[in-house]
């Protein structure tokens, strides 16, 4: 089976029992809650990617970042003959609450943005049915049971309906 590699940088912002998530619009995690973040642009450092992606997907500016760590997951969509090895660098972030929130790009269809906006998800409401593997990995970490070994999803179901917010 072919294995494709994907590397991304993602923000973990956890406040008052809620995790900052985005509503994904495309890809294997579409219509699920995902972490703000994504791929590096040419010549971009990790923290530059982090702050740019958070701004693009949530409209927030990052005030500080800390606790860098790396995890990986393997995702094979159902009925696909390839698997994605998704390597993720995570940073804990604090948002700049005094800065005005920037308007999120509405150019989702042109590929500039794959987020419909942000939502604060109660950690107890995050499930495999409504969240990406990245969010699920962070949930275990936040609950005090971090899974350091690879996690595999061998029959990942892509959602074709939007998630329901509580």
Stretch-by-stretch model annotation:
Residues 1-19, 41, 65, 88-92:
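Conserved N-terminal beta-strand and adjoining loop/helix that marks the start
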Residues 18-56:
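Conserved Nudix-box catalytic region and its N-terminal flanking loop in Nudix hydrolases
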Residues 29-31, 36, 63, 69, ...:
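A generic structural signal for short beta-strands and their flanking turns/coil linkers
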Residues 40-63, 74-131:
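Unchanged
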Residues 68-74:
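Generic short beta-strand segments
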Residues 108-166:
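Nudix hydrolase/Nudix homology domain
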């Amino acid at each position: 089976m072919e294995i494709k590699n994907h590397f991304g940088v993602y923000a973990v912002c956890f406040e008052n029992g809620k995790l900052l998530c985005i509503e994904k619009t495309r890809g294997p995690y579409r219509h699920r809650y995902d972490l703000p973040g994504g791929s590096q642009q040419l010549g971009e450092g990790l923290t530059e990617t982090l702050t740019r992606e958070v701004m693009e997907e949530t409209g927030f500016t990052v005030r500080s970042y800390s606790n860098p760590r790396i995890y990986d997951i393997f995702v094979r969509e159902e009925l696909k003959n390839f698997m994605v090895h998704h390597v993720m660098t995570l940073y804990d972030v604090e948002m700049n609450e005094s800065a005005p929130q920037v308007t999120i790009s509405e150019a989702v269809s042109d590929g500039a943005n794959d987020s419909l906006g942000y939502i604060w998800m109660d950690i107890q409401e995050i499930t495999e049915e409504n969240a990406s593997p990245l969010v699920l990995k962070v949930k275990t970490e936040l609950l005090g049971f971090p899974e350091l070994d690879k996690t595999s999803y061998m029959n990942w179901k892509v959602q074709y309906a939007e998630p329901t917010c509580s």
